[in-house]
Amino acid sequence: MCGISGIASRRLRPDELRPVAERMARSLRHRGPDGTYVQCFSPPTTTECLALGHNRLAIIDVSEAGREPMSNEDGTLWLTFNGEIYNFREVRPRLEARGHRFCSRTDAEVIVHLYEEKGPDCVSELDGIFAFAILDLARNEIFLARDRIGVKPLFYAATHDSFLFGSEIKAILASSLIEPRMNRQAVSDFFTFLYVPCPETAFEGISQLPPAHTLQLRLHDHSFSIKRYWEVARDEGVEHCSYEQLKSEIRKRLAAAVERQLVSDVPLGVFLSGGVDSTVVAGLAKEAKADIQTYTLTLPGDEYRFYNEAVKGRAVSRHLGTQHCELPLEVPELDSILDLVEFSDQPFANPTSYLMYELSKKAREHITVALCGAGGDELFAGYPRSAAVRLARKLEAVPRPLVQFGGKALALLHDSHRNPRLRRARKFLRGLNSDFFVQYCHWTYFLSEGEKHKLLNGDLARQTDGNGLKPSAEILRSAFNQCSLSEPDNCVLEMDLKTFLADNVLEYTDRMSMATALEVRVPLLDCGFVELGLNVPFAYKIRHGRTKAVLFDAFSEFFPSEARNAPKRGFNAPLGQWVGRLFDDYFDIHGRRSGPVREKLGEDVGASWREGILDIGFIQQLRTEHHRGKSDRSHELFACMIFDVWWRKYIRKTQPLVHW
């Protein structure tokens, strides 16, 4: 994995180009500690000033021959690439047979020569996780592409005289050609989802290229077109397979994906929580590579037992025979959690990002590449909401007053942040009277449209009320309507894959691992396996009360007895226990000029509500509900804190950026 960046500008003179391109590349140096390189082009070679940047994390062919940006034989094509191409060993001989000359053993060089053969259609033959840019001097174009599922990120911005791109938003901001301004729609969506959905970003004028899309920039007029090149297709053959046939096919295809993703010239291991997905990946890795290492992040202390994965991880490792390493996590300081906003460059309030950062940082002392189990929940109905969809359908026959009575009874119970099950049950019952996508927002996400209208104050609130901003549930509706699978329940899973997985799980997986220069691979998101998994009949996914049933049964021998019936916990952080004690100080309405939060985070803590962006009255209401145990509001309050940090660092620019 690496970091990529680039610029095409009519505004810059040749002597101004290199300093800008170097600033952009240097901002991504955490993604590639093995070298930062910039290649510049200017008239008369080109019609305007162009530059490509690359930060290298060497994985395949670590020699200087793999250095990027790299070109084809005659220098008419130049590539900067982030990711891994898993089928490069199959593609390369075909290209060599057609006369292409290779100068390295890298997977990246295959892209250059495949583009020579196929042009933009080259992406259809690439199996991997990637984001790349090709400067095509002969066609006077820049071609951008992002992998099918969205494992690797790619952002871009276009002005009247410049086009910029990068693996992270910070590369674009580092150019100083884009003034950071808040995107109101994105901020509204953030307070629903706790992340910003693609293709929006929190900055006006900066977008994210969606997964499975390409972008062609025509340099003669800076016009560009975006095109989808892949979509999950319905597979009637899979739909009609028996349970036993599908177990066999799942095993065969996933084993092949894991074996392909074990290729590395540097140390490699597996993240192991002891859950179904990571256990399956670890078991297959062990079958293919006898000396596989596994790593588990542990949270010592009885108060964290709901979140601690140590016991299950240890049991699975012992059962599989892996070389196991437990990585204990200390209770973090608030500033260390909040400063992680700099790795996303926009509001992102899933506290699991901190766990991924610490796991990656600690594992990086031992390995450079890790395999993880991301994707299993979306493919095989592992989340509680997958069962909720079916339960809601059954409850349609239950009289509404009875359902409402159940909701009122749950409201009387004291809510504890130590166990999220009560919160889920309340949200489930609250959403039953709504349109399906509004229901799903209730079950899965956080602030409702009505609550956001109370929180988002001043100009932002007026925009949200009546000036063209869309309800966040429309993002889910749009993703669902693009699905072509035969079963509605599987379409919901695909919707999750396109939204929750791509914009949340893969966002923090990439940003937090690459912040430590660790490459994370995701075998369950091999595109062929994704197509298989989403087409498996839903009845095989939730079966006899077990979620992910067919996946578990396909690999049942990998699970020790103590892990077979353990409840799903997920990779979650004990947010309420970590930051609850600091809410009072952060949201102090009187603006005390002392206290641990202000000492570490700056005297302008709370600028976003003092300046009328957020409504402190509604925040106080959330605090009251939280303190009285009426409702666990730790995630919503944490989101307000994250937004305030982002606002001060990126929009007001009153707080320094500590990580870049």
Model-found features: residue ranges?
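Generic hydrophobic alpha-helical membrane-span motif
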Residues: V38-C40, P153-Y156, V280-G283, L379, ...
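Short low-complexity, flexible loop/linker segments enriched in glycine and/or proline
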Residues: D339-F343, R364, S386-A388, W578-G580
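Short secondary-structure boundary/capping segments
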Residues: V311, V341-E342, P384-L391, P656-V658
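Adenosyl-5′-phosphate
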Residues: M1-I4, A8, A97, D121, ...
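Phosphate/oxyanion-binding loops and surfaces in catalytic or ligand/nucleic-acid-binding neighborhoods
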Residues: S27, R31, F88, V151, ...
